[in-house]
């Protein structure tokens, strides 16, 4: 057999042995941090190695459009103008590469513009910043970045709301950093800064990996179904401070927040992991490091006693001085392996259908 034929045969063999796999919606995130990257790579592979993704997503990823934004001059000088260039009813991935710098804009991505990616550089992350408040825009519309569309992704982006911290006296002082109301959204290595109501994790399936979220009160709130993996939750300010205010309203709702391999840090002490904003919140912390800033009771007492029987607050194999359970409120769920696995696998956010890694550009 000649060299040419051998080369062709080897090439064909490489094509046929390239793994094509379904992302596993069942395998839980491992307890050991060193194994998390392996789990992610095995279950959130690139498009070429995947089966079972939504057909619309597969079609959208076939020929991505890349556009550049630079405040100092480029294809677009503002992020708003770049987003305006995406047609309504968009059907293909649009990757907006953001140059380093500060973008003083109030940005909204409408529902009819799916498949948008905002991408910055990891060592010089662009900053989207605005100072909107509830008094001027209403709470959920005060965000510096509002995403209403599906299949959104953000990579290496900082989002801030620079409005002053609420003083307890000024009406309408809530000021969101971001509101995510679209379905199937992923955030990789992003940072969100605010005080009260930093992130409105509103509705839909969402995935946050290696992110940083800073705030004071209810700084992750809404009715989303979201997994936060390897994310730092940093609490600032003083007074009553609460991380999560999930807005579950009934036992039938499948939404909730899952914090996995996260780290709770902050200033002062007495921080609550969550509170019952509505009757049926669902919040789980797994493999999470809790520093001494966490209140020994863990969760805020319910103002409505009946909610003691309807909240679902789970803790699973967490660590650190803030994780001690001796003084936890009685409605804390010390969940077992079977129960925990629901919140530790991609099935919780339907990840096998839509979750992709950051683009390799």
From Swiss-Prot:
<dbReference type="Pfam" id="PF01095">
    <property type="entry name" value="Pectinesterase"/>
</dbReference>
<keyword id="KW-0964">Secreted</keyword>
<comment type="similarity">
    <text>Belongs to the pectinesterase family.</text>
</comment>
<dbReference type="InterPro" id="IPR011050">
    <property type="entry name" value="Pectin_lyase_fold/virulence"/>
</dbReference>
<comment type="subunit">
    <text>Interacts with PMEI2, and in vitro with PMEI1.</text>
</comment>
<dbReference type="GO" id="GO:0005794">
    <property type="term" value="C:Golgi apparatus"/>
</dbReference>
<dbReference type="GO" id="GO:0090406">
    <property type="term" value="C:pollen tube"/>
</dbReference>
<feature type="active site" description="Nucleophile">
    <location>
        <position position="218"/>
    </location>
</feature>
<dbReference type="GO" id="GO:0030599">
    <property type="term" value="F:pectinesterase activity"/>
</dbReference>
<feature type="binding site">
    <location>
        <position position="275"/>
    </location>
    <ligand>
        <name>substrate</name>
    </ligand>
</feature>
<feature type="site" description="Transition state stabilizer">
    <location>
        <position position="196"/>
    </location>
</feature>
<feature type="binding site">
    <location>
        <position position="174"/>
    </location>
    <ligand>
        <name>substrate</name>
    </ligand>
</feature>
<keyword id="KW-0134">Cell wall</keyword>
<keyword id="KW-0732">Signal</keyword>
<keyword id="KW-0063">Aspartyl esterase</keyword>
<comment type="pathway">
    <text>Glycan metabolism; pectin degradation; 2-dehydro-3-deoxy-D-gluconate from pectin: step 1/5.</text>
</comment>
<dbReference type="InterPro" id="IPR000070">
    <property type="entry name" value="Pectinesterase_cat"/>
</dbReference>
<dbReference type="GO" id="GO:0005783">
    <property type="term" value="C:endoplasmic reticulum"/>
</dbReference>
<keyword id="KW-0378">Hydrolase</keyword>
<dbReference type="GO" id="GO:0042545">
    <property type="term" value="P:cell wall modification"/>
</dbReference>
<keyword id="KW-0256">Endoplasmic reticulum</keyword>
<dbReference type="InterPro" id="IPR012334">
    <property type="entry name" value="Pectin_lyas_fold"/>
</dbReference>
<dbReference type="GO" id="GO:0005576">
    <property type="term" value="C:extracellular region"/>
</dbReference>
<feature type="signal peptide">
    <location>
        <begin position="1"/>
        <end position="23"/>
    </location>
</feature>
<keyword id="KW-0961">Cell wall biogenesis/degradation</keyword>
<dbReference type="GO" id="GO:0045490">
    <property type="term" value="P:pectin catabolic process"/>
</dbReference>
<dbReference type="GO" id="GO:0009860">
    <property type="term" value="P:pollen tube growth"/>
</dbReference>
<dbReference type="GO" id="GO:0009505">
    <property type="term" value="C:plant-type cell wall"/>
</dbReference>
<comment type="function">
    <text>Acts in the modification of cell walls via demethylesterification of cell wall pectin. Involved in the pollen tube growth and determination of pollen tube morphology.</text>
</comment>
<dbReference type="GO" id="GO:0050829">
    <property type="term" value="P:defense response to Gram-negative bacterium"/>
</dbReference>
<feature type="binding site">
    <location>
        <position position="277"/>
    </location>
    <ligand>
        <name>substrate</name>
    </ligand>
</feature>
<feature type="active site" description="Proton donor">
    <location>
        <position position="197"/>
    </location>
</feature>
<protein>
    <recommendedName>
        <fullName>Pectinesterase PPME1</fullName>
        <ecNumber>3.1.1.11</ecNumber>
    </recommendedName>
</protein>
<keyword id="KW-0333">Golgi apparatus</keyword>
């Amino acid at each position: 057999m000649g060299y040419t034929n051998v080369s062709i045969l080897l090439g064909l063999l490489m094509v046929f042995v390239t793994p094509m796999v379904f992302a596993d919606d069942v395998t839980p995130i491992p307890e050991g941090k060193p194994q998390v990257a392996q789990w992610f790579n095995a279950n959130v592979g690139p498009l070429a190695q995947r089966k079972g993704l939504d057909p619309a997503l597969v079609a959208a990823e076939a020929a991505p459009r890349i556009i550049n934004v630079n405040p100092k001059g480029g294809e677009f000088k503002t992020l708003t103008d770049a987003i305006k260039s995406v047609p309504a009813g968009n059907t293909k991935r649009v990757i907006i590469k953001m140059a380093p710098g500060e973008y003083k804009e109030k940005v909204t991505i409408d529902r009819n513009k799916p498949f948008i990616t905002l991408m910055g550089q990891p060592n010089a992350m662009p900053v989207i910043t605005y100072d909107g408040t509830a008094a001027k825009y209403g709470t959920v519309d005060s965000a510096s970045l509002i995403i209403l569309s599906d299949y959104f992704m953000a990579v290496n982006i900082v989002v801030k709301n620079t409005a002053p911290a609420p003083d307890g006296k000024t009406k309408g002082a809530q000021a969101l950093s971001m509101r995510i109301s679209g379905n199937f959204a992923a955030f990789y290595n992003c940072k969100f800064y605010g005080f009260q109501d930093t992130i409105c994790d509103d509705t839909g399936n969402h995935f946050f990996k290696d992110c940083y979220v800073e705030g004071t009160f209810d700084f992750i709130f809404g009715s989303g179904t979201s997994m936060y993996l390897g994310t730092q939750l940093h609490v600032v300010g003083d007074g009553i401070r609460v991380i999560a205010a999930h807005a579950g309203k009934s036992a039938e709702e499948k939404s909730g927040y899952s914090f996995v391999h996260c780290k709770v840090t902050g200033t002062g002490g007495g921080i609550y992991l969550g509170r019952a904003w509505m009757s049926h919140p669902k919040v789980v912390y797994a493999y999470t490091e809790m520093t001494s800033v966490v209140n020994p009771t863990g969760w805020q007492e319910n103002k409505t006693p009946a909610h003691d029987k309807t909240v679902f607050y789970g803790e699973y194999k967490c660590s650190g001085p803030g994780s001690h359970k001796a003084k936890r409120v009685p409605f804390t769920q010390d969940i077992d392996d079977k129960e925990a696995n629901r919140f530790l696998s991609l099935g919780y956010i339907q990840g096998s259908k839509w979750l992709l890694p950051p683009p390799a550009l």
